[in-house]
Amino acid sequence: MSVKWTSVILLIQLSFYFSSGSCGKVLVWAAEYSHWMNMKTILEELVQRGHEVTALASSASILFDPNNSSALKIEVFPTSLPKPEFENIVTQEIKRWIELPKDTFWLYFSQMQEIMWKFGDIFRNFCKDVVSNKKLMKKLQESRFDVVFADPIFPCSELLAELFNIPLVYSLRFTPGYVFEKHCGGFLFPPSYVPVVMSELSDQMTFMERVKNMIYMLYFDFCFQIYDMKKWDQFYTEVLGRHTTLSEIMGKADIWLIRNSWNFQFPHPLLPNVDFIGGLLCKPAKPLPKEMEEFVQSSGENGVVVFTLGSMITNMKEERANVIASALAQIPQKVLWRFDGNKPDTLGVNTRLYKWIPQNDLLGHPKTKAFITHGGANGIYEAIYHGVPMVGIPLFADQPDNIAHMKTRGAAVQLDFDTMSSTDLVNALKTVINDPLYKENVMKLSRIQRDQPVKPLDRAVFWIEFVMRHKGAKHLRPAAHDLTWFQYHSFDVIGFLLACVATVIFIIMKCCLFCFWKFARKGKKGKSD
């Protein structure tokens, strides 16, 4: 047989192998904003590898347009909440979160709690709209999906996985106080050296900082999400027709893919069914648009500064915009500022405003000297990947923590958005640009980020395919999920051992008393004789 025909037969065999054995069907409970950006990167790679991906999204979803052509299949389910109203709620609640008073612990977190409860009610209604839609549920059941993929910060996917009896893979950045990670995933975060997320602490804590960390942990564990989780418990119990809890159903997840990495996160124990996939969006820079490239090149040896506060921040107050613009006008670098609003009066000739910028491509440009960021995880990972020091102006959620982590690593300077002056911003930029330590530190983080045997995206895809191939990954799931809280902490064993010790001590004491009584009685009898 000729080499030509041998090659043809081998290709045919390979095509049969990949078409029949390797391609799976993935059901996705869609997320919003940056959560969806990360998930979409994984899903597009799955499609490239021949898998069929169906994203389940509500008619109110902000990022989904069913008319847009996409490799992903979009299954839109109707909901009573109109899209413009949902978008307005998100905008208003995020604005409210940003403006919360940060100087009072109880006031800040109690109001943040109300915001989370409001979103919880909305997403619970979305979930009700899905499971009550018999036609849709029948269609999904008949599709015979191999795995459900979701971000657990938007609950419901675990209910679908339970109803359809299929494996579940999570992709998560964090939940406030690590509540879902600990209560549902069984993660370990010893408060003695692992700072609670949103505490802005490092892993090198003083005694009083450990006290603060413990207070944060107790608050998040016993107060923050309890009310909302009980609502989910009740809803899941009604749907499944048996008593259950959100923690129990979420705890059945086969794999947790955490969008973090060890050059970003402080070290802590990990379970076998947990893997880090931080930096999914990091990639080599592409050429800039012609007009933008010309502006960057015009900066000469001074280089450029990239500035963005993210896609969720619009209509910045005029006073704050002018303070920032005034500061940027005082530096020798050219500035590319992602800004959606009226042009500030103090805008300098060295600054250009854009409604959108190719952030990754700009950060990867050799003339970029610094990155002014709100501290979103995606932006920080891109800055680390390309080795760009940062000036952090965190606004809400995990952003203060993210910047605090970079500050601890010596890769960033942190400012307060509400109180910073033009001088503060100028000095911060001069520090990260002119002090070589910041560049050295972020380059060290960059080398660590790039020095991985398997890329984060490939690891994420591997685990999803692994779960599809093996119909789950229960062999990696710790038995801790099957224990009650007192069994998990061995309180029953400790109680039993204490009871045994107490019994032995009691018997010894009784024997001693009996012997003492015997000897005392014998002594009295001898004296009387």
From Swiss-Prot:
GO terms for cellular component: endoplasmic reticulum membrane. It comes from the Eukaryota. Glycans are attached at residues 67-68. It is found in: Microsome membrane; Endoplasmic reticulum membrane. One of its GO terms (molecular function) is glucuronosyltransferase activity. Its EC number is 2.4.1.17. UDPGTs are of major importance in the conjugation and subsequent elimination of potentially toxic xenobiotics and endogenous compounds. This isozyme has glucuronidating capacity on 6 steroids and the bile acid, hyodeoxycholic acid. May potentially play an important role in estrogen and androgen catabolism in peripheral steroid target tissues. This is UDP-glucuronosyltransferase 2B23.
